């Protein structure tokens, strides 16, 4: 747990949990069919036998397609484990992580701390696939104005990837979001 005073407060985390449980539009696909690079195409990126940690999995739509996937989320709408990434503890180390819109809220310090927690759950040789919202308030409901989006930019990915020993190998638009791939040998 972070002792950083700029880390996400319990009140903000509860607000986000309520928002994504009750106000966020959900479906069986969780919107994955709307995106190309960060949608169902990600299934093709996973090699046989690779293990995947899906951070902020929501309704866990990739679970039925990827055998070794463990989904965590602050909501209980479909995750394998209801926990925030900052509090996720595991002995297992994963080959791949998905952060498809989940590490996307709060200050830079919160993003850094959450990223560090995710990286700590990964093997040395690993990949991270990101879908980042560059602070577009396009959820289609009135409460979105109160969502504490982080304003993602390429520079943030380059800085954080370097900090944790990764290289940004892909960065491109995916509809109104960014698709980013980090790799570490």
How would you describe each model-predicted region?
Residues 45, 120-121:
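Generic structural signal for beta-strand residues in well-ordered domains
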Residues 102:
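Hydrophobic adenine-recognition pocket in adenosine-nucleotide-binding enzymes
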Residues 106-107, 122-124:
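Helix-to-beta-strand junctions that scaffold the AdoMet/dcAdoMet cofactor pocket
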Residues 105-117:
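A short, conserved alpha-helix within the catalytic core of class I
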Residues 2-88, 109, 127-185:
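Class I (Rossmann-like) S-adenosyl-L-methionine-dependent methyltransferase catalytic domain
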Residues 98:
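A conserved beta-strand element that flanks and buttresses the S-adenosyl-L-methionine
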